[in-house]
Amino acid sequence: MSIRPLHDRVIVKRKEVETKSAGGIVLTGSAAAKSTRGEIIAVGKGRILENGTVQPLDVKVGDIVIFNDGYGVKSEKIDNEEVLIMSESDILAIVEA
């Protein structure tokens, strides 16, 4: 897959998580809530500040992040794979191992 986000945008591949009900039944597909964790697969060059300089992003390719799956997040299918395009400001945290 070859995609290059612009400015402060990032491309995230959602990480699917196994979800169990209170009774121990594994929920999959539409019965399970979508994960708000993902892996950064591409990053833009950075945010353009008012003075014209570019501020690099805090996230990098390979980071596992927790994101806000809200209004500004765009879902797109590229090479038969679903990815999310979002601004860095939609990322809430970087998961550190």
Curated annotation (Swiss-Prot):
Disulfide bonds: none annotated. It holds the Pfam family Cpn10. GO terms for biological process: chaperone cofactor-dependent protein refolding. Belongs to the GroES chaperonin family. Together with the chaperonin GroEL, plays an essential role in assisting protein folding. The GroEL-GroES system forms a nano-cage that allows encapsulation of the non-native substrate proteins and provides a physical environment optimized to promote and accelerate protein folding. GroES binds to the apical surface of the GroEL ring, thereby capping the opening of the GroEL channel. Heptamer of 7 subunits arranged in a ring. Interacts with the chaperonin GroEL. This is Co-chaperonin GroES. It comes from Klebsiella pneumoniae (strain 342). The lineage of its organism: Bacteria, Pseudomonadati, Pseudomonadota, Gammaproteobacteria, Enterobacterales.
